[in-house]
Regions:
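Contiguous, function-dense segments enriched for cysteine-driven chemistry
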Residues: 10, 16-20, 34, 64, ...
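Acidic, PIN/NYN-like endoribonuclease modules and their adjacent C-terminal/linker elements
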Residues: 1-3, 102-131
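Active-site neighborhoods of divalent-metal-dependent phosphate/nucleic-acid chemistry enzymes
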Residues: 72-115
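Short, well-structured N-terminal submotif of metal-dependent ribonuclease cores
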Residues: 1-39, 51-60, 118
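Alpha-helix N-cap/helix-start and coil->helix boundary motif
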Residues: 41-45, 82-83, 119-120
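A cross-family signal for key residues in well-ordered alpha-helices
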Residues: 12, 48, 86, 103-106, ...
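Active-site-proximal, substrate-binding regions of enzyme catalytic domains
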Residues: 45-73, 84
């Protein structure tokens, strides 16, 4: 099993069970050590809020999912240097948010798993889709 960088949607699809969860299960079986920039948590909170507002999650479910996510990613969150993020955003044309994940993958020499096709098309050497 290797270490990989994952974005928030990969974490969300693993924990919020749905049609894409099976692919995330396979990914976790192959590469069980997941890391991410600290930004993942803010983005995950946003996913939970959105699901609550659409009625897809009850508040108590959100709390459980938050605990599960924090447990999954404990000691695996990195502070990203802002100038490095700017550099990657400039080089790739990706949003600063996405560039945090790309920068971390580049800096650690790891693959970034994401469901964002735009990121994959702009960074084919680093980013890939879980399948």
């Amino acid at each position: 099993s290797c270490m990989i960088v994952v974005d928030t949607n990969v974490i969300a699809y693993l924990l919020i069970r749905g049609e894409r969860s099976a692919a995330m299960d396979r990914l976790q079986q192959l590469d069980s050590e997941w890391v991410a920039p600290r930004l993942w948590l803010d983005e995950f909170l946003n996913v939970l809020c959105t699901h609550e507002r659409t009625g897809a999650l009850a508040p108590e479910q959100s709390v459980e999912l938050l605990e599960d996510a924090v447990a999954l990613m404990s000691d695996a969150s990195y502070d990203m240097p802002p100038e490095r993020v700017l550099t990657v955003a400039r080089q790739t044309g990706c949003r600063a948010y996405d560039s945090q994940y790309i920068a971390l993958a580049q800096d650690l020499g790891l693959k970034l798993y994401t469901c964002d096709r735009q990121v994959i098309s702009k960074c084919p050497g680093v980013a890939r889709m879980p399948d």
